[in-house]
Amino acid sequence: MLAKRIIPCLDVRDGQVVKGVQFRNHEIIGDIVPLAKRYADEGADELVFYDITASSDGRVVDKSWVSRVAEVIDIPFCVAGGIKSLEDAAQILSFGADKISINSPALADPTLITRLADRFGVQCIVVGIDTWFDAETGKYHVNQYTGDETRTRVTQWETLDWVEEVQKRGAGEIVLNMMNQDGVRNGYDLQQLAKVRAVCHVPLIASGGAGTMEHFLEAFRDANVDGALAASVFHKQIINIGELKAYLAAQGVEIRVC
């Protein structure tokens, strides 16, 4: 069995790490490189960097910090933000990123997933899905351009359908960003994760809602996700990664202990 992964997420805007609640009202957390190094030193398995306004601004992720991050950490990292071409992806990978993640650009042009997978291999290609639960209809809908709350829009895709579509097109991994839970630290949406897990045959990463060590355990044990991504609990030092991993290992979760 592959070890479960603990993945700090760093949302980047204007060259700094920020964090919001339900993708709104972002506060500045700090500089990118020192935070990346801190998480690597604490025992993170991987890092994810989202340039959150790149797609809504119509630009590609700012690459100036990618090589600086690669110089100070020795764990895999993934970069996302406005990647719309093979050239964009090649540049980011050449600067030292191990994976690239696409979200809004994949919704705009689903063939991008296949072209990237064919060129760089499925192991490099992550698709991020920003999913919102509509309590009135009981359905999960995919959102686009979520980095800017004034431009966020609901797409025609229901989440489970899009999960199946991106796999057919070559996604090697899926990060499910559960917008209702984002930043509120009440736990991952286990019901939604279970529904997605049933149709997801590539590695699935849970994102949105971690507030306690138990929340990570629930995601691994009850929803059988491959990795758990979190931001505010790590940024605000509510949870230490080394202590989290020791706790999970004690609960019988297969994990790479620091």
From Swiss-Prot:
SUBUNIT field: Heterodimer of HisH and HisF.
EC top class named in words: lyase
A biological process term (GO) from this entry: L-histidine biosynthetic process
Cellular component, GO annotation: cytoplasm
EC number(s) per entry: 4.3.2.10
Name listed for the protein in its UniProt record: Imidazole glycerol phosphate synthase subunit HisF
Keywords: Amino-acid biosynthesis, Cytoplasm, Histidine biosynthesis, Lyase
Protein origin, superkingdom: Bacteria
Localization terms from the record: Cytoplasm
Pathway annotation: Amino-acid biosynthesis; L-histidine biosynthesis; L-histidine from 5-phospho-alpha-D-ribose 1-diphosphate: step 5/9
InterPro entries cross-referenced by the UniProt entry: Aldolase_TIM, His_biosynth, HisF, IGPS_HisA/HisF, RibuloseP-bd_barrel
GO molecular function: imidazoleglycerol-phosphate synthase activity; lyase activity
Described purpose of this protein according to its UniProt entry: IGPS catalyzes the conversion of PRFAR and glutamine to IGP, AICAR and glutamate. The HisF subunit catalyzes the cyclization activity that produces IGP and AICAR from PRFAR using the ammonia provided by the HisH subunit.
Active-site residues, Swiss-Prot/TrEMBL: D11, D130
Reactions it catalyzes: 5-[(5-phospho-1-deoxy-D-ribulos-1-ylimino)methylamino]-1-(5-phospho-beta-D-ribosyl)imidazole-4-carboxamide + L-glutamine = D-erythro-1-(imidazol-4-yl)glycerol 3-phosphate + 5-amino-1-(5-phospho-beta-D-ribosyl)imidazole-4-carboxamide + L-glutamate + H(+)
Family label: Belongs to the HisA/HisF family.
Major location (coarse): cytoplasm
